UniProtKB/Swiss-Prot annotation:
GO terms classed as biological process: amino acid metabolic process
Binding site for Zn(2+) 1: 76, 109, 172
Gene Ontology terms, MF aspect: aminoacylase activity; metal ion binding
Subunit structure: Homodimer.
Superkingdom of the source species: Eukaryota
Protein name: Aminoacylase-1
Pfam families (alphabetical): M20_dimer (PF07687), Peptidase_M20 (PF01546)
The organism's taxonomic lineage, starting at the top: Eukaryota, Amoebozoa, Evosea, Eumycetozoa, Dictyostelia
Length: 408
């Protein structure tokens, strides 16, 4: 679709979508250059922090009372890969159809919120409005690969982050297919568990007892029985009080490995019972579950002789933000949305975002993407966002963020 007379904010959004920050080789230098150029154009003070190994772009609008706790608008600039053959258009072309639907990797997760935060900052600076509290923006890398190493997980433990003096963080949420908007106050802890079984070997023609695969299968069956219990719990209530995905523990068998390879090829010896078998599980645990008790459950599942486990991903702590009248940030956020006739639905985020690193420091964090009446397409083929929904999202943030920053 021709971009003549296109809204300038939509044009900026589409330009950012075209930058290839997809894994495994995200072009962070180009995204950093883009953000720095916009900060200069919008007269927003900025710096590029590189101590974690990959550029983190920080912007700041200083408040009249800089000693007060500040508000952080956090967004990640990286996106997941896209299978080009499964898209109807180039996933990095930011193509827009006649209905105003913009197709591209990152339209929902989360380059939309990146640019909406930036536009809010631009409007605040342009208006000359004086803020009570300082407003920070952070554009971070590597969220899509867990935020570890060079992303938010490392950044939160730096002196630079401590100096930001954060009182509240706003981060990404999810699209809502209904007229409601979803706000997330916690998320499930991602545990990736690798189980190894060791047992007796022998010829495939015999009934060998105590084999590795037998031991592993017994454990797998126990864990899949637990999975079925959680599945039934999720789908038990179909009324308004029914559980959401973030309320239950999901468990999926994602890795299976066994067999004796022949000459390091893809062929295996079918007549040899292997001495070792392995399985990997992706487990997502809601913050309402005691993690120490769940760890004991895994130990019980793997208690049989010859079984052991280790974590490929492990989070020992998983805090959530309280949504009660004692939380002044929440009361302000909720009241701001009420004034705009926005109906909020509160949930636990079913996957993981950088917010978990913030919450685990004891800092309140809300996951909120102002996207409604839109199918949830993060990480999916043909991910899109309508330009009208995008522009309304900027207005929604303008109705929320200044109120938070000017809060007593």
């Amino acid at each position: 679709m021709n971009s003549i007379q296109e809204n300038e904010h939509v044009t900026v959004f589409r330009e950012f979508l075209k930058i290839r920050t997809d894994h495994p080789t995200p072009d962070y230098e180009s995204s950093t250059k883009f953000l720095v150029e916009k900060a200069k154009e919008y007269n927003i003070p900025y710096e590029v922090y590189r101590e974690t190994g990959t550029p983190i772009v920080l912007m700041k609008i200083e408040g009249l009372e800089p000693n007060l706790k500040t508000v952080l608008l956090n967004s990640h600039v990286d996106v997941v890969p896209a299978v080009h053959d499964s898209w109807k258009v180039d996933p990095f072309s930011a193509w827009k159809d006649e209905s105003g639907n913009i197709f591209g990797r990152g339209t929902q997760d989360m380059k939309c919120v990146c640019m909406q935060f930036l536009e809010v900052a631009r409007r605040i600076v342009q208006s000359g409005q004086k803020l009570k509290r300082t407003l920070h923006l952070s554009f971070v890398p590597d969220e899509e690969i867990g935020g570890s190493g060079k992303g938010m997980e490392k950044f939160v433990y730096t002196e630079k982050f401590r100096q930001l003096n954060i009182g509240l963080c706003l981060d990404e949420g999810l699209a809502s297919p209904t007229n409601d908007f979803t706000v997330f106050y916690g998320e499930r802890a991602p545990w990736w568990v690798h189980i190894t079984a060791v047992g007796n070997a022998g010829h495939g023609s015999r009934f060998i007892e105590g084999t590795a695969i037998e031991k592993l299968m017994r454990t797998i069956n126990k864990m899949l029985a637990f999975r079925q219990e959680q599945f039934e719990s999720l789908h038990h209530g179909q009324h308004e009080c029914g559980k959401k995905l973030g309320d239950v523990t999901s468990l999926n068998l994602t890795v299976l490995k066994a067999g004796i390879p022949i000459d390091h090829s893809n062929n295996f010896s079918y007549n040899v019972i292997p001495t070792q078998a392995e399985a990997g599980f992706d487990i997502r645990i809601p913050p309402t579950v005691n993690l120490d008790q769940f760890l004991d459950q895994i130990k019980e599942w793997t208690a049989e002789e010859g079984l052991s486990f280790k974590f490929a991903s492990y989070i020992p702590k998983n805090e959530m933000t309280k949504l009660d009248s004692d939380n002044k940030w929440w009361e302000n956020f909720k009241e701001s949305c009420k004034k705009m006739d926005i109906n909020l639905v509160t949930e636990i985020f079913p996957a993981a975002t950088d917010s978990r690193f913030i919450r685990n420091l004891g800092i309140p964090a809300f996951g909120f993407s102002p996207i409604n009446n839109t199918p949830i397409l993060l990480h999916d083929h043909n991910e899109f966002l309508n330009e009208k929904v995008y522009l309304r999202g900027i207005d929604i943030f303008m109705g929320i963020i200044p109120n938070l920053v000017n809060m007593e």
